[in-house]
Swiss-Prot record:
Transmembrane segments: none annotated. Residues 250-338, 341-426 form the Ig-like domain. Keywords: Calcium, Disulfide bond, Glycoprotein, Immunoglobulin domain, Metal-binding, Repeat, Secreted, Signal. SUPFAM superfamilies: 3-carboxy-cis,cis-mucoante lactonizing enzyme (SSF75011), EF-hand (SSF47473), Immunoglobulin (SSF48726), Kazal-type serine protease inhibitors (SSF100895). It comes from Mus musculus. Residues 81-135 form the Kazal-like domain. Residues 175-210, 211-246 form the EF-hand domain. Ca(2+) 1 binds at residues 188, 190, 192, 199. This is Follistatin-related protein 5.
Length: 847
């Protein structure tokens, strides 16, 4: 008997010695494997060892496991109380990995675990010869599954670093693909391009992965990432499992140009493709758009396209798209917004006597710049051009010298661009003075009556001046009564020896009314243009100093200081400003429940092609922020924080070409002035500094020119803004004039161009600059301006006022005079003396 068991024991040792593991190489070492086979049931080794041990170590007279066979999953134990041999469920099985499925649907690491479970559950569990249980159950949660895959990548990465001598801190995304390629090559032991369950089993055994992966195993790769459910993993499925993204972008689509017409909707489609492409991220001016909940860019679509629901000029510019996490593959969309032409002609009608000169002008704006043409009575005038009939300023002006009766007609200006066509008619009547027609009468009344006048508010009341002949049309004295009231225009103050007026700011309301602030009387006067009389006084908060007419909403905004020391500044609004109704002010909603911190406000001015402005900004004293307001509801919307840029805003300018705000910042404690900030109105985000440009910004009416004035440096910088919203450097002008104010005037020699005139706060000259060429000229000897202490209402102690879209005249005051400049000839037209402190000037008229 003993010999028999000795033989069995020796055979057991031989069997154990023969069951070893294949030699591992560095990292994953398995190069081949034996296919997984199903073995017949036999007594587990741990149970055999127990029986042998019981035989070799006799346990006394009461019980022995020598002849006790307990069956699979159980072993023999001696009951400590009865000292008899009994069968009990095995405490544990020998660690080895040979996974099988039980008939109870559970997954087991080996046969022994099946039998042990049957014993513990007291039910019959057989081995099922398929792998269905490998893919059932939900013990492997998503977070654990992700951790398992990360661990596999880390293991492979260690080998990759060792073998390839790579830097472990290099880009994870770029390194992931070779790691997964190597891992798949190792898993695919038979190199057939597919990984099956047997190969996964061998990897688990080889790497002892079953000890480290908690509730997840390699079989979960087949469970969750076998995309076509063929119970094999191909390389593409491996890429999917480990999120190896292979993206492609055709070379000819790296830059895409898209054009849309204002008012339409637009779709920008990202051409980046690839299996498992992550969500597409869109940026504008390096600001991510996807999570901003924008009103007009609010649906990115399942395909990652960018949708703009209603295109405006603010949307023009560059947009970039890329797959999330893969910013190195990006597409740039150059988005151009086309705007149909909008035309204005001047004059609408005119009468001329034979032998004089007539001029018909046409101004057109659109994107791109429109091409102009002229018809006379419906027939193209180009074939009829001569010395007597010429086109000037790139076709924007018809010039007729020595007019004849046959020149009478309807002259139609036509503007065309890619987005559309517009036209308008300017009528010319050639008649001698003896045949005065109704058209002639109407034209003369329009030209010499209430329109095309400068209104000057000065110490001795209000003067209405016709600029061509420098004639007074009306003088409203301080003692004149308001129409229908007993109040005087400027009541005599007790401390004044003579009755005089104090004015601050004034605005033109649709050429119908002029609103003008009287800061020492805490009120606004309304001047009726038709009757040239003061018709109403509107009470305001103390010391109203700044007015702005919001044409989009027919509102006049009023900034009052509260006192000369600016102790309690407030904002008020007069609604229905152009209506023939009694007017009053209403307060705006306080920002942060604080009325007394308002230092200034900014509302963009509408243009010929952009007629509606929806938002404005409030500036608080010494605060690094812009407070956005809804002009329609007069309520606060949000705050744009400028602290990170260390900018306390002083003044703003706006261009509709790309929708940029340019912000000049207050000098810091060292006296250094930070560069201008640029804010994108689409996202309300700071997109950076405007290069190294500093100073007060001004933007031309067409939005194309940004002129920045830095008095400290004596520098005027001109930048050009393209129809794609690009900001380009143009030229610099060095001057010691100390610019007080700027006025833009359309060029008389070039269509679609502007000139600027700059008045001086200290000197007697006016600066002229032709923006298209950089040509500079000085108009000299305009006498000294008001002293700054005599004009406390703003920093512009010498105002300069243009005369509208077609006007050739500008007005600027000195201390005791008015100067009218001829912008067409770039020279002084006339001086009007005995006008003291006439620094409040308004133009009324179409010209």
């Amino acid at each position: 008997m003993f010999r028999c068991w000795s033989a069995i024991l020796i055979l057991g040792f031989i069997f154990l010695a023969s069951e070893g593991r294949p030699t591992k190489e560095s990292g994953y070492g398995l190069k081949s494997y034996q296919p997984l086979t199903r073995l017949r049931h036999k007594q587990e080794k741990s149970q055999e060892s127990s029986r042998i041990k019981e035989f070799l170590i006799h346990d006394g007279p009461f019980g022995s496991c020598e002849n006790k066979y307990c069956g699979l999953g159980r072993h023999c134990v001696i009951n400590r109380e009865t000292r008899h041999a009994e069968c009990a469920c095995m405490d544990l099985c020998k660690q080895h990995y040979k996974p099988v499925c039980g008939s109870d649907g559970e997954f087991y690491e080996n046969h022994c675990e099946v039998h042990r479970a049957a014993c513990l559950k007291k039910q019959k569990i057989t081995i099922v010869h398929n792998e269905d249980c490998f893919f059932e159950g939900d013990n492997c949660m998503a977070i654990e599954y992700s951790k398992m895959k990360s661990m596999l990548l880390d293991l492979q990465n260690q080998k990759y670093i060792t073998q390839e001598n790579e830097n472990p801190n290099s880009d994870d995304i770029s390194r992931k693909k070779p790691l997964v390629d190597q891992m798949f090559k190792y898993f695919d032991a038979d190199s057939n391009g597919l990984v099956d369950i047997n190969e996964l089993t061998q990897v688990i055994k080889q790497e002892e992965l079953n000890k480290d992966l908690s509730d997840c195993t390699l079989y979960d790769l087949l469970k969750y990432d076998d995309f076509n459910a063929d119970k094999h993993l191909a390389l593409e499925e491996f890429y999917r499992a480990f999120q190896v993204i292979q993206l492609s972008l055709p070379e000819d689509q790296r830059v895409s140009i898209t054009a849309a017409t204002v008012g339409q909707s637009a779709v920008l489609s990202c051409a980046i493709v690839g299996t498992l492409r992550p969500p597409i991220i869109w940026k504008r001016n390096n600001i991510v758009l996807n999570n901003l909940d924008l009103e007009d860019i609010n649906d990115f679509g399942d395909d990652g396209s960018l949708y703009i629901t209603k295109v405006t000029t603010v949307h023009m510019g560059n947009y970039t798209c890329y797959a999330d996490g893969y910013e190195n593959v990006r597409q740039t969309h150059i988005f151009q917004v086309n705007v149909p032409p909008v035309i204005r002609v001047y004059p609408e009608s005119q009468a001329r006597e034979p032998g004089v000169t007539a001029s018909l002008r046409c101004h057109a704006e659109g994107i791109p710049d429109p091409q102009l043409g002229w018809l006379k009575n419906g027939i193209d005038i180009t074939p009829k051009l001569s010395k007597q009939l010429t086109l000037q300023a790139n076709g924007s002006e018809v010039h007729i010298s020595n007019v004849r009766y046959e020149d009478t007609g309807a002259y139609t200006c036509i503007a065309r661009n890619e987005a559309g066509v517009d036209e308008d008619i300017s009528s010319l009547f050639v008649e001698d003075s003896a045949r005065k027609t109704l058209a002639n009468i109407l034209w003369r009344e329009e030209g010499l009556g209430i329109g095309n006048m400068f209104y000057v508010f000065y110490e001795d009341g209000i003067k209405v001046i016709q600029p061509t002949e420098c004639e007074f049309q009306r003088h409203i004295k301080p003692s004149e009564k308001l129409l229908g009231y007993q109040d005087e225009v400027c009541p005599k103050a007790e401390e004044d020896e003579v009755q005089r007026c104090v004015w601050a700011s004034a605005v033109n309301v649709k050429d119908k009314f002029i609103y003008v602030a009287q800061p020492t009387l805490d009120r606004i006067l309304i001047v009726d243009v038709q009757s040239q009389k003061v018709v109403q006084a509107v009470s305001t908060d103390p010391v109203p100093v700044k007015l702005h007419y919001d044409k989009s909403h027919d509102q006049v905004w009023v900034l009052s200081w509260g006192s000369m020391e600016k102790t309690s500044p407030t904002l008020q609004v007069i609604t229905l400003a152009s209506g023939n109704v009694p007017h009053h002010t209403i307060h705006t909603q306080p920002v942060g429940k604080q009325f007394d911190r308002v230092d200034d406000f900014f509302i963009p001015t509408p243009t010929l092609i952009i007629t509606h402005m929806r938002f404005g900004f409030i500036l608080h004293k010494d605060e690094s922020a812009l407070h956005k307001i809804d002009l329609e509801t007069m309520s606060y919307i949000k705050t744009i924080n400028l602290k990170d840029s260390r900018c306390i805003p002083l003044s703003l300018a706006y261009t509709h070409l790309g929708g940029y705000y340019f912000i000049s910042c207050k000098a810091d404690i060292t006296g250094a002035t930070p560069p201008q900030l640029v804010v994108d109105s689409v996202t309300d985000s700071i997109i950076g500094f405007n290069s190294d440009v500093t100073g007060t910004p001004y933007v031309s009416p067409d939005g194309h020119y940004l002129v920045s004035v830095n008095d400290v440096k004596g520098l005027v910088r001109v930048q050009y803004i393209t129809i794609r919203g690009e900001i380009l450097d143009a030229f610099d002008i060095h001057t010691n004039l100390h610019i007080s104010d700027l006025a833009f005037q359309p060029s008389f020699t070039e269509a679609h161009q502007y000139n600027i005139y700059g008045s001086s706060s200290q000197q007697t000259d006016v600066l002229f600059v032709e923006l298209s060429s950089g040509k500079v000229k000085m108009i000299k000897s305009l006498k000294e301006p008001l002293k700054t202490e005599d004009w406390p209402w703003s920093q512009k102690n010498r105002h300069i006022q243009g005369s509208g879209l077609f006007g050739q005249y500008l007005m600027t005051p000195s201390k005791d005079s008015l100067f009218i400049l001829d912008g067409r000839l770039n020279k002084l037209n006339c001086e009007i003396t005995e006008v003291q402190k006439g620094n409040t000037v308004v133009w009324v008229g179409d010209a």
